[in-house]
Design a protein with these regions (language model features):
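GST-like domain detector, emphasizing the conserved glutathione-binding G-site
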Residues: 1-116
Length: 116
């Protein structure tokens, strides 16, 4: 899982779930769907990528690639939607979103990769 150490140290003090995302990003939508499916409370940090809000020095300090989504969970920064989804399902196991059967889980990951 791409857990990164941000240079924007402000996010290290964030408590709870904070999602940096964009309404026009499919990858952001996937993470928002998981947050809602699990019934988790989270704080929205919407970035307008059409106005290039994701390529500012402040955001590069959170995600050096300047991509959305980025999740901050109690100061831990996680990038890449598949890894964020895995983190959420592991950290908040109910309701489970991943099959317990290894073959079914591999098939799920196959379709997740196709859906990007």
């Amino acid at each position: 899982m791409p857990v990164i150490v941000p240079t924007n140290e402000e996010v290290l003090s964030y408590a709870g779930l904070h999602l940096f995302h964009s309404g026009v990003s499919n990858c952001s939508m996937r993470v928002r769907m998981v947050l809602e499916e699990k019934g988790l409370e989270w704080e929205s940090h919407h970035l307008n990528i059409l106005k290039k809000e994701h390529i500012t020095p402040e955001y590069f300090g959170i995600n050096p690639a300047g991509l959305v989504p980025t999740l901050v969970n109690d100061g831990v920064v996680i990038i890449e939607s598949d890894d964020i989804i895995d983190h959420l399902d592991d950290a908040f196991p109910e309701p489970p979103l991943k099959p317990s059967d290894p073959q079914q889980r591999e098939q799920m990951y196959f379709w997740l990769r196709k859906a990007v």
